[in-house]
Structures are given as structure tokens and as C-alpha cells.
């Protein structure tokens, strides 16, 4: 049972004398570990990227694919691999919510690291993250840093594949830029406010009517107004647009 082996991992950390606070396991198939990355101090309205990765208790790991279109790959990890990554995060102190600032660093990128717990998620914000640094920020960054390509065959139960979501969040920010085409689906607005833009959830079957997924920030028109539109796959635990606000820095 996922609760038991994640709980055992937390116990092992404590017995090792690593000084981490008591950690509570994630619910079965719940979120275990997630890393969201933001660049610079000024966010573009509606620019809600996929997380670098999100790991779940059933071994599912969804990792963003860099590029102008928001897509992801899905990996299926063994229980041992999930335990190892969870334990590493606990050792780094990521089971306790905190904010780690970078003194004297301007325009820094920010990581938001979320660790699943039975009592609710713990979120750590790291400014100017540098996994090679010797300070507490470096230690925290190392606890969250993960390149899915580094996972070996022994860590996986199946080959990686394209992530095929059942739903998409479509995030629209009004713009004065000319639209290149009309939005063919139900109206983009009004929606849930997300990152100074409006968000609606569409089924994958509806998004397929757009043809190839549009690039993030492409301009569409509806109701006489132009919008910069971002079509973002929703992750397994993201129920609605409001969920996306939880991971903002």
C-alpha cells in the first residue's frame, strides 16, 4: 500500500538522524512531489506553464517537454524509485513549508516545490535555485531537482510515452494584438481568474477540433476581442482552473 511504503521511507530518514521533521506520507495515488519553475520577476498574464515534473504515489511521473507547445511525457516509476525521490526531498527539508530567498539577487528565477503529506501539501519557494550551491537553498534545490532522462531501466515499469490528457485548461489574456483566427469552441470568457487571465476547462475531444495544439501565446478572437491563448494539459490531480493558482510563487 502506498501509504505504508512512503511512511516507511519517512521513518528511515528519521532513524538515520538526518534531522528532518516528522513527515507524513501522501495518500494513495496522490501527489508526492512537484516542481514548478518561474523565470524573472514579471510574469506574463496567463502564462501558466506545466510543472517541470509532477510525481504521484502510483508511480506516475508527468514531465514537461520544452517547446512552444505545452506537451509532456509520462513515466511509470517503481515503488522503490518513488520512495527514493520522496526520501531525498525529506532529507532536504522539503517536508516543511518555507521560503528561501536569495540576498542581493535581482530578476531571479523561482522554484515552487510541493511535497504531498497526509495533512496537506508542504510548499517551499526557492529564489535563484542552484543545486550546486552549498547553502540551504542549494540543499533544497538538490532535493527537488530531477531530470527524468536520468532514470534508469530499473526505476521504470514501462517505457516513457507521450502524456495524453483527458482535459485541457485554456487560459486567455486580453490583448490589443491582431488575431490570426477566430476561436471555434465555446467562448473563452468569462472564466476563472488565473494569473491575471481567465481560464476554462475543455475536454480533450473539443481541443482536438483545433487541429494541432497551438503554440502558447497564439492570438485568437472571440466576441470582438483578441486574446493570447495558452492551451495547457491538465495533470491527473488538477480538478479545475482554480487548482492552477495553488502553485504560483
Regions picked out by a protein language model, each given a short descriptive name:
Residues 14-17:
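C-terminal motif of bacterial Sec signal peptides marking the signal peptidase cleavage site
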Amino acid at each position: 500500500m502506498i501509504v505504508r511504503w512512503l511512511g516507511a521511507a519517512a521513518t528511515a530518514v528519521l532513524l538515520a538522524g538526518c534531522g528532518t521533521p516528522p513527515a507524513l506520507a501522501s495518500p494513495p495515488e496522490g501527489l508526492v512531489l512537484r516542481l514548478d519553475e518561474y523565470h524573472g520577476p514579471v510574469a506574463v498574464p496567463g502564462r501558466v506553464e506545466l510543472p517541470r515534473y509532477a510525481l504521484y504515489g502510483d508511480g506516475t511521473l508527468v514531465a514537461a517537454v520544452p517547446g512552444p507547445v505545452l506537451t509532456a511525457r509520462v513515466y511509470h516509476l517503481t515503488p522503490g524509485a518513488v520512495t527514493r525521490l520522496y526520501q531525498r526531498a525529506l532529507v532536504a527539508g522539503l517536508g516543511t513549508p518555507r521560503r528561501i530567498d536569495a540576498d542581493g539577487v535581482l530578476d531571479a528565477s523561482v522554484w515552487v516545490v510541493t511535497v504531498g503529506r497526509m495533512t496537506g501539501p508542504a510548499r517551499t519557494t526557492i529564489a535563484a535555485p542552484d543545486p550546486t550551491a552549498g547553502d540551504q537553498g542549494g540543499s533544497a534545490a538538490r532535493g527537488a531537482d530531477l531530470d527524468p532522462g536520468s532514470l534508469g531501466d530499473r526505476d521504470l515499469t514501462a517505457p516513457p510515452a507521450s502524456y495524453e490528457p483527458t482535459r485541457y485548461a485554456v487560459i486567455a489574456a486580453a490583448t490589443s494584438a491582431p488575431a490570426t483566427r477566430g476561436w471555434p469552441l465555446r467562448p473563452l470568457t468569462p472564466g476563472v481568474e488565473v494569473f491575471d487571465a481567465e481560464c476554462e476547462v475543455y475536454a480533450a475531444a473539443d481541443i482536438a477540433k483545433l487541429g494541432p495544439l497551438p503554440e502558447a501565446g497564439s492570438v485568437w478572437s472571440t466576441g470582438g476581442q483578441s486574446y493570447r491563448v495558452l492551451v495547457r494539459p491538465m495533470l491527473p490531480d488538477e480538478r479545475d482552473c482554480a487548482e492552477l493558482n495553488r502553485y504560483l510563487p
